[in-house]
């Protein structure tokens, strides 16, 4: 449920567009492989519209989750309330025949204005926010995001923090999380990316509706 063509494309070692958005990779064999895979996957549902409720009832074998969603619903009591009828855990995204177990990752960027009169102070502040382990550890305490520091992501204190309210044996594997971050794909966000993606998405939806 909720597995998209874009996720399949990334996991097959390719992106829909080049870095500047001046050309697409639609004619690449890896792109067509990805679309065919998603189409065959959807055909197994035999026109049944799978919903999030099917997952909640334990009728779905696999569903992509964001890290923030995982953190929201794994701890007690939310997990017991929403997913009490079955056990579930996290694994890496499936790999395409020409790719790897990769998934899209959103990154929060920090920047400094070229017009600032306090360049050194601004640069020191950015470095402090991004390299200080105590500050980076607060990300796990106060948000549903992940740190940019491997030392924080793989630390025992972080693992204990994430798993303290998780019932049973369903713990978050920090080495898995670190690997997912290392192999994550940050999309090329060129100027007209949203428009290009929406047009592509509509075309692909039409392609998937055409019978063989």
Tell me the role of every PLM-derived stretch.
Residues 1-24, 60-62:
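Extracytoplasmic/periplasmic solute-binding protein
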Residues 57-69:
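Alpha-to-beta junction loops
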Residues 13-24, 105-110, 181-185:
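Flexible glycine/proline-enriched surface loops and loop-helix/loop-strand junctions
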Residues 165-212:
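C-terminal capping/gating helix-and-loop segments adjacent to ligand/active sites or protein-protein/ligand interfaces
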Residues 7-9, 19-49, 93:
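Glycine-centered hinge/linker elements that transmit conformational signals in sensory
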Residues 70-78:
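Pocket-flanking alpha-helical
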Residues 4, 30-37, 50, 59, ...:
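Extracytoplasmic/secreted proteins, especially bacterial periplasmic and envelope-associated proteins
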Residues 43, 78-150, 183-185:
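Extracytoplasmic/periplasmic substrate-recognition and gating elements
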